[in-house]
């Protein structure tokens, strides 16, 4: 059976499937990634670093993953970290050790990905503190992601492939660290201790660092099932997101091809993951935000606290213009709607279906989205109102078992976005997922 028939238990050979966040992250991508990882041969990441996070439950044990793809939890799965990533090796080794077993034998790292050093994290904190004093805080995770991509783009960063020859790596390392210490006036930094750690990483990982481009394209020729796991989400994309309140990598579909080196024609299916309401961590415009008791209700019921930072997430109503904008960019084929159960108990639910200019009164054109920093000053959301439901829906197994008002809400989203909603999350566990025919 073909995956286009949406039977996740029966993937046909040679499928390349991408799972991408369609909002500001934290959509609940981990669950569907975990479900599909069991049926794939290779699971890949193509962007970001340890600023992403999934919490996956397998056999009643929870795993917090920030760098490793979810497929690492399944013995039949090969996992790949692509060249578009920035890798903090200490964090990676800690994740590997937390899972245990011989999982490193199933892990490959691109020789073209960049190494994220502790000094990048130090610089991240310095930059964020400066912006805070200026009232221009971005709200980064302070994991060093932006500074590492900065050294990459400035052509002074160090690729993971350099670690295979340790003496060569050592020379590059000392030059980079000395330059960054001088540039940011960092007085206290233990280079010797970090170099000792990197020698251990060299011994442990030298055979796992490969030419991922060749590896991936050979696997494609072998008709392997490949699952591509997006980190962060479309509205945090460095180009398409709400700049400057974005991450530093390409989080949209184009990042797959530049971050893994695979042919764009090989991608069979793009799954857009959409939370039933909207959340955001950190600063930046959020035009459907609920700074009231409803927002607090969603935060507590949905456990909306960051996997990586533990920061409380801002909550608001679902934004259809945002989804249409993201659909244009990512060419979403089907939707996984998550956390519908969190809306249970609300008397009414609002759905943002458009934006009206505060100046002219005109509606924003379909497919456009106001991503600029001053968007809330220029546009106001247009809402459609839906009646809520009181029932606990976590035990619903079919779409028809959902309360009528819940069905109406889901169908309205499907109508406005014009993409089929195939999976609906109605609870935190893997089996709390409805497949909508």
UniProtKB/Swiss-Prot annotation:
This entry carries the following GO cellular component terms, namely: cytoplasm
Q: Which reaction does it catalyse?
A: IMP + L-aspartate + GTP = N(6)-(1,2-dicarboxyethyl)-AMP + GDP + phosphate + 2 H(+)
Protein EC: 6.3.4.4
Q: In which pathway does it act?
A: Purine metabolism; AMP biosynthesis via de novo pathway; AMP from IMP: step 1/2
Q: How is the cofactor bound?
A: Binds 1 Mg(2+) ion per subunit.
Compartments, record wording: Cytoplasm
Q: In which residues is Mg(2+) bound?
A: 26, 53
Where GTP binds, per the record, is at 25-31, 53-55, 62, 307, 313, 339-341, 425-427
Q: Which UniProt keywords apply?
A: Cytoplasm, GTP-binding, Ligase, Magnesium, Metal-binding, Nucleotide-binding, Purine biosynthesis
Q: Does the keyword section mention Aminoacyl-tRNA synthetase? A: no
Membrane-crossing residue ranges in chain numbering? none
EC category name: ligase
Q: For this UniProt entry, what is the primary localization, expressed as one broad class?
A: cytoplasm
Please, what other remarks does the record include? Answer: Parasitic protozoa lack the de novo purine biosynthesis pathway and rely exclusively on the salvage pathway for their purine nucleotide requirements.
Protein's UniProt name? Adenylosuccinate synthetase
Q: Lineage of this protein's species? A: Eukaryota, Sar, Alveolata, Apicomplexa, Aconoidasida
């Amino acid at each position: 059976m073909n995956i286009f028939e949406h039977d996740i238990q029966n993937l046909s050979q040679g499928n390349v499937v991408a799972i991408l966040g369609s909002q500001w992250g934290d959509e609940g991508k981990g669950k569907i990634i975990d479900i599909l990882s069991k049926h794939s041969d290779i699971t890949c990441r193509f962007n970001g670093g340890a600023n992403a996070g999934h919490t996956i439950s397998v056999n009643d044990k929870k795993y917090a993953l920030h760098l490793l793809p979810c497929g690492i939890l399944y013995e039949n799965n090969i996992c790949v970290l692509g060249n578009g990533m920035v890798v903090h090796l200490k964090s990676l080794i800690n994740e590997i050790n937390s899972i245990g077993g011989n999982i490193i034998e199933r892990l490959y790292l691109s020789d073209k990905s960049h190494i994220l050093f502790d000094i990048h994290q130090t610089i991240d904190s310095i930059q964020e503190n400066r912006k805070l004093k200026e009232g221009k805080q971005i709200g980064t995770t302070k994991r060093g992601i932006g500074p590492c991509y900065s050294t990459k783009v400035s052509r002074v960063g160090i690729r993971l492939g350099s670690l295979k020859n340790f003496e060569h790596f050592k020379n590059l390392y000392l030059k980079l660290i000395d330059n960054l210490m001088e540039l940011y006036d960092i007085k206290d930094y233990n280079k010797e201790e970090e170099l000792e750690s990197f020698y251990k990483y060299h011994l442990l990982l030298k055979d796992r660092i490969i030419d991922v481009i060749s590896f991936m394209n050979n696997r494609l020729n072998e008709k392997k099932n490949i699952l591509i796991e997006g980190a962060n989400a479309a509205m945090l994309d460095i180009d398409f997101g709400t700049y400057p309140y974005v991450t530093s990598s390409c989080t949209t579909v184009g990042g797959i091809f530049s971050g893994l080196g695979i042919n764009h024609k090989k991608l069979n299916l793009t799954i857009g993951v959409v939370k039933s309401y909207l959340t955001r961590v950190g600063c930046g415009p959020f035009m459907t935000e609920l700074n009231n008791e409803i927002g607090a209700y969603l935060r507590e019921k949905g456990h909306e606290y960051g996997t990586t930072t533990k920061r409380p997430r801002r909550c608001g109503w679902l934004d259809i213009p945002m989804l249409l904008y993201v659909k244009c960019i990512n060419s979403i084929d089907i939707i996984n709607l998550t956390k519908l159960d969190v809306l249970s108990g609300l008397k009414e639910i609002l759905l943002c279906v458009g934006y009206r200019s505060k100046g002219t009164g005109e509606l924003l054109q379909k497919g456009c989205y106001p991503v600029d920093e001053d968007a809330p000053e220029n546009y106001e959301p247009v809402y459609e109102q839906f009646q809520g439901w009181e029932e606990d829906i976590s035990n619903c197994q079919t779409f028809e078992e959902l309360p009528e008002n819940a069905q109406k809400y889901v169908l309205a989203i499907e109508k406005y976005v014009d993409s089929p909603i195939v999976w609906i999350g109605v609870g935190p566990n893997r089996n709390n997922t409805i497949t909508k025919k």
